[in-house]
C-alpha cells in the first residue's frame, strides 16, 4: 500500500522502469520513512503522509503507540532526525492515507487531513501526562521514564516482571 501511495503522489503508478521511478520518487519526496516512526513520506516543501492499512471499512486504525496527529511537528519525539532534518520546517500538514486491503488488492483508499481527523496534540499530551503522574503516585513502585508513557519495574514479588505503559 505504501508503494502505491508513493506512486500515486509521484505519478509513477504505470512506470515499469525502476530507475525512472526512483528518480521521480527522489524529486517528489524529501523523506521516505521507516516502519517504526511517523511519517511514512514527506512531499518536498509539502505535506507529510502517514499510510495506514486496515482489513475492513469498520476496522480501527493502528497507530503504533502514537496518538493521532492533526499536524506533524519537528519537535515531536516520535520522529527521526532524518525526518526532522529532511528540509527546513517546524510544522507540516499530515495526510492519513487509509487503505482497505485484502491480501494484495486495494478495495478503498481514503486521504484524510490530520486536522479533520485528530485533536490538537495538547489534548493527547495532557492525558498522557496525567496518566504518568497518576502512576507515579502509587506507593512502593519503581517507575522509569521511557519513550512510551513509562514503565513500572519489578511489579511482582520476584522482581522479574515489568509493566510497560504504552500509548495508543
Q: Where is each model-derived feature located?
A:
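Nucleic-acid endonuclease domains
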Residues: 1-47, 53-168
Amino acid at each position: 500500500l505504501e508503494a502505491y501511495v508513493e506512486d500515486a503522489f509521484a505519478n509513477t503508478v504505470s512506470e515499469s522502469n525502476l530507475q525512472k521511478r526512483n528518480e521521480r520518487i527522489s524529486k517528489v519526496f524529501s523523506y521516505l520513512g521507516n516502519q517504526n516512526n511517523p511519517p511514512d513520506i514527506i512531499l518536498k516543501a509539502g505535506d507529510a503522509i502517514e499510510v495506514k492499512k486496515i482489513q475492513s471499512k469498520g476496522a480501527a486504525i493502528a497507530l503504533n503507540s502514537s496518538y493521532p496527529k492533526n499536524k506533524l511537528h519537528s519537535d515531536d519525539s516520535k520522529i527521526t532526525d532524518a525526518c526532522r532534518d529532511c528540509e527546513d520546517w517546524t510544522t507540516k500538514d499530515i495526510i492519513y492515507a487509509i487503505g482497505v486491503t485484502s491480501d494484495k488488492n486495494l478495495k478503498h483508499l481514503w486521504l484524510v487531513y490530520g486536522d479533520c481527523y485528530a485533536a490538537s496534540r495538547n489534548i493527547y499530551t495532557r492525558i498522557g501526562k496525567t496518566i504518568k503522574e497518576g502512576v507515579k503516585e502509587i506507593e512502593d513502585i519503581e517507575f522509569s521514564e521511557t519513550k512510551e508513557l513509562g514503565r513500572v519495574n519489578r511489579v511482582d514479588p520476584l522482581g522479574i516482571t515489568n509493566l510497560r505503559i504504552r500509548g495508543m
